């Protein structure tokens, strides 16, 4: 029974990782990706951030852009929905 449970957990983890990779691939394959990325940079710069990097990722199974940015000497982790670029999460990275 323990072996079956362990195998199930491993299979589920692999399937989840595969789904996340597929979502990332979809974002990077979007023909408007570079435009949307540039819009995200401008949006965050207007809010006073200096952008360190922005990458495609998934958040709760949805495509997002994850940004590392600095403001007032502090580092922030910011998650924007993709492609509409609404801020989902904005927190100080300790």
Where are these regions (language model features)?
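Amphipathic, hydrophobic secondary-structure cores in small proteins
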Residues: 52-55, 59-66
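Classic N-terminal secretory signal peptides
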Residues: 1-19
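Post-signal peptide N-terminal regions of Sec-secreted extracellular proteins
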Residues: 20-21, 46-49, 94
């Amino acid at each position: 029974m323990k072996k079956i449970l362990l195998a199930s957990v491993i299979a589920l983890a692999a399937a989840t990782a595969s789904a996340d990779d597929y979502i990332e691939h979809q974002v990077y394959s979007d023909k408007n990706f570079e435009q949307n990325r540039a819009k995200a940079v401008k949006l965050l710069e207007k809010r006073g951030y200096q952008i360190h990097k922005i990458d495609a990722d998934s958040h709760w199974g949805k495509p997002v852009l994850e940004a590392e940015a600095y403001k007032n000497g502090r580092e922030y982790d910011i998650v924007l929905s993709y492609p509409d670029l609404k801020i989902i999460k904005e927190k100080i990275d300790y």
